[in-house]
Curated annotation (Swiss-Prot):
The species this protein was found in: Escherichia coli
Miscellaneous comment: Plasmid Clo DF13 originates from Enterobacter cloacae but is stably maintained in and studied mostly from E.coli.
Protein's recorded name: Protein L
Domain of life (superkingdom): Bacteria
Function of the protein: This protein inhibits the multiplication of double-stranded DNA phages, such as P1 and lambda.
Sorted UniProt keywords: Plasmid
Chain's gene name: L
Length: 87
């Protein structure tokens, strides 16, 4: 789970979850749609990934019972510094 302090909370912004990137699950090797923190939906391992880079390969980490790795965006980062166009 991503962590923050009371001092760094001011840098986080809650947004609507209706965008597809919040609901989508991504496979190893897929292109990262948005920079941010991603969480494996099976084991909870978290990674940081840059937009347009590939997600880590299947051998990045293993699951028991051969469950597939699926990444979910949990924190999107504002790499443009424009607050995602939100005023």
């Amino acid at each position: 789970m991503a962590a923050y302090t009371s001092e760094t909370a001011k840098f986080l912004q809650s947004v609507s979850s209706d965008q597809t990137w919040w609901k989508s699950r991504y496979n190893p090797g897929d292109s990262v749609p948005h920079s941010g923190i991603y969480r494996c939906t099976v084991c909870g391992k978290e990674i940081t990934s840059n937009g347009n880079d590939p997600f880590p390969p299947q051998n990045h980490h293993q699951h028991s019972q051969q469950q597939a790795i699926k990444w979910q965006l949990i924190v999107r980062t504002d790499t443009k510094g424009d607050r995602f166009g939100i005023k």
